[in-house]
Amino acid sequence: TCVLISSGLHAQTTQGSMTLGGNFGYSSSKSEGFYGVYTSSSFQVSPKAGYFIMDNLEVGLGFGISTGKSGPDGSEPTKTNSFSAGPYARYYKFTSNDRFAFTGALGFSFGSGKSSTGNSENKTGSMGISIAPGFVYFLTERWGLDFQLNGIGFSSYDPNKDVDNNNQKEFTFNISSLSPTLGFRYYISK
């Protein structure tokens, strides 16, 4: 009976299976400095759909929707909204515990958004590549709890897309800042 249960758990990641799910994240901070109290908050949702092209290798399409607000207390806050989309590939490496697998993901994203303070509004554009380690814990044969760190990434960001050709490029390494995302996935076996 144990063999049937463990082999059933690996069925979610076999060639021809699919997955639906996503991650979500929220951050909030408040700091006091020379110019007073500064507050910041953001929320993001990232739905994904994937297909296993071979055992333990998923490819799919992900979307990102985020909103945020920041600024000094007593002043008009800066509000941001953005949308991104792009393909990803994710590999699953199961441990001796058949309910637990380490994951490594490679993703590409293309996005746009806007930033506004009072009556002033700027359109933004971005493009990025990321490598993200994580793990999935299978709660049942169909549901997995997904945890991912924002790993190594390269992004190109244009903070004022509608006015000039000013581009900022940055290399980010986020493991030390521990920017985790948490989500659920539903696995559909073939």
Regions picked out by a protein language model, each given a short descriptive name:
Residues 34-38:
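Short, polar loop/linker segments at the starts of domains and inter-domain junctions
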Residues 30-32, 115-118, 164-168:
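Extracytoplasmic loops and strand-loop junctions of Gram-negative outer membrane beta-barrel proteins
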Residues 1-16, 189-190:
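Cleavable N-terminal export/targeting peptides
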Residues 168-178:
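Individual transmembrane alpha-helices with interfacial aromatic-anchor signatures
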